[in-house]
Each structure stands twice: as C-alpha cells, then as structure tokens.
Amino acid sequence: METFLFTSESVNEGHPDKLCDQISDAVLDACLAQDPDSKVACETCSKTNMVMVFGEITTKANVDYEKIVRDTCRTIGFVSDDVGLDADNCKVLVNIEQQSPDIAQGVHGHFTKRPEEIGAGDQGHMFGYATDETPELMPLSHVLATKLGARLTEVRKDGTCPWLRPDGKTQVTVEYYNDKGAMVPVRVHTVLISTQHDETVTNDEIAADLKEHVIKPVVPEKYLDEKTIFHLNPSGRFVIGGPHGDAGLTGRKIIIDTYGGWGAHGGGAFSGKDPTKVDRSGAYIVRQAAKSIVANGLARRCIVQVSYAIGVPDPLSVFVDSYGTGKIPDKEILKIVKENFDFRPGMITINLDLKRGGNDRFLKTAAYGHFGRDDPDFTWEIVKPLKWEKPQS
C-alpha cells in the first residue's frame, strides 16, 4: 500500500495573531448585537504592552472598543507582563473610521437594495472543502492539530497543568492512503507541541504532562504506534510569549481557520468582517455546499469554489471537483449545488443568519477553526438534504 505524509498546524487562543483575530471578532459581535446592519472591517495588531484596533465601521451601535480589547485579552489569560501582555495596563489605540461612501453606494445602494440585490462587498474567490475521513467531514491532520490546541487551553484554564501560559502551537503529520481520490488516514506519524510555560517547570515535566493530559485525550489510540514521533517543546525554552514574544495581526492564520492546507484558499481572512464581506460569507456557504455533497453521499471528498465582483450580487463562477470520488459526474453535482444553494451575499446572510452577533458568536470562530465545529451558532455546518438519484449499476 503506497502512503504519503501530510501535515497541518494550529495555534492556541494565546498566540498573538489569534489574539488579534479574537479582538476583531469581539468588536464585530458587539456591533452586530446592537445593530445587525453594522458594516464592520476591523483589524487588530499587537506588540509588547500595546494593542491597536483600526479599520472601517459604520454602525448605530454604541461600542466601547477599549473595553472589548481589555476584556478579550483578560479572558484569554493575558493578565500580567510575565505572560506576554497585561490586559488592564497595556496601551490600547483605536483608529476607526466610517466605511467609504464609494463602497457603501456600490454594495448597499445606501440601504435601498433588497437582500437579493445586495452586491458583493469586494471581488475575490473562496473555497469550501469536505472529506469523509472524520465525523466532522474535515481533514484528520487539521482536526487533531486544532483539538490539541484547544485541549492545551482547557488544561491551562482548569488548572490541570498550572505551568502553562496562553501562547502555543501544535502540528500533526498524518500518514494517508489515497483510495481512488478519497483520503484514508492510516496512522499519526508525528505530533509537535510548542507551548509557552512558566519558569518553574522542567522540560521532562512538560513532556510528561503534554503526553498524559493533552495528547492522550485527543489523539485516538488507533492512530498511535511505537513509531509515532513526539516533539514536545523542541526548542527547549518558551517562557516569553504572546505579543511580547511576537507581533500579532488579524488575518494571519487563514489556513488554521479553514482546512489545514487541504483543498485550496482564495486568500481572504475572516475575522472582523461583517457578512457583506464575501471573504467570510462566501467561504461559509461553500463549506456548507461541500459538506452537504459529502454528507449526502454524492462524493467522498469535494471542493467547491465561488467567485465575486464588487457590487454584483450573483457569483461570477461556481466550480465543483470531487477528486474522482463522485457517484455522478461533477457537472451534475454542480447543477445540484446551484439548485440548492443561493450564493448571493444578501441571501447567504439570511439563510445562514449571519447578522446575528453577540453571545461571542463570531468570537468563538476566531480560535480553533471556523469549520467542523459542533455548535448551533455555526449555521454553515448544517447539512442540507440534496435529492439525487444513484446511477443504476
């Protein structure tokens, strides 16, 4: 059996880039909670002792940006300079303006347009991907890397591993078998974890705790064997972390947010963007389309692309590739997709309920992935029933 290796990585909520994603989405949530028609393009950057939020926001909401920044940093665990940022004493800079009137009239017609007439907020192309290798219909390498990161945060916050600090990265290499275009995981080849820690803990204690409390509960035993390689804090020391260790920026972790390197990516980031930004809403609807194709048995693995022009409601193109795993030809799958999914931005917003913010709805997406999550707020993960007829064999 010929196999190959494929690797995906993830980062924790305390990674400086992910901190920025979460602040941007916390701002989006706050705006949408008070004004569902808010137009938000919120970027965040961070470095030692400083967080800046900047961008274009048009909203009726009354939002305390500084409070959102401090609350988000504090919740993640940035409560002192020692851990990389002090939420209560860091500098917070805010530079937010209104959306450009040129963009507003082109996309929304200054709110005179009906939902089906609302144009795309920008040009671009987005991809959705699904694979039958996990219950989530997501790639195993990505699922495991993501869950290891989430578990690191869990054992830090519940006190299981009190030496942990907020920043950290994970990476998983899976050995795969290609079954006529479908991906079949055989085993986990390598697990890599680099986590921020305090001064008191030894490297041996770190390795033992990570194996027992992080890897064991996450990686199914059937994928581990005596040949699996573990790299646990291979650099030897990771005390300085968060924005103190590295600068952070919104939109720098787009592969971690999506499919871990599988499928394809159009390049647009998600966090801090309201649903008129097709970078986000377009990517959500094509994930629902790809997932529905696989869940309905039309294919074992599939990618869907959609593309847009600024100000134009209808997509310029829709593309489906089942990697040779389709039960019917791809052009017929494409026809089913076009009949069942409305790719106009205003209709995506309604059908996936994307104007509903608050209750950390979009903040939740900003760490540990936007796809494959079992949470009713992730409306794009709901499988649509697709009618099709199996060919007579």
Swiss-Prot record:
Annotated keywords: ATP-binding, Cobalt, Cytoplasm, Magnesium, Metal-binding, Nucleotide-binding, One-carbon metabolism, Potassium, Transferase
Residues noted as binding K(+) in the record, renumbered to the chain: E43
GO cellular component, one term: cytoplasm
SUPFAM superfamilies reported for this sequence: S-adenosylmethionine synthetase (SSF55973)
One Pfam family, short name: S-AdoMet_synt_M
Binding-site positions, L-methionine: E56, Q99, D246, K277
Subcellular location: Cytoplasm
Record's protein name: S-adenosylmethionine synthase 2
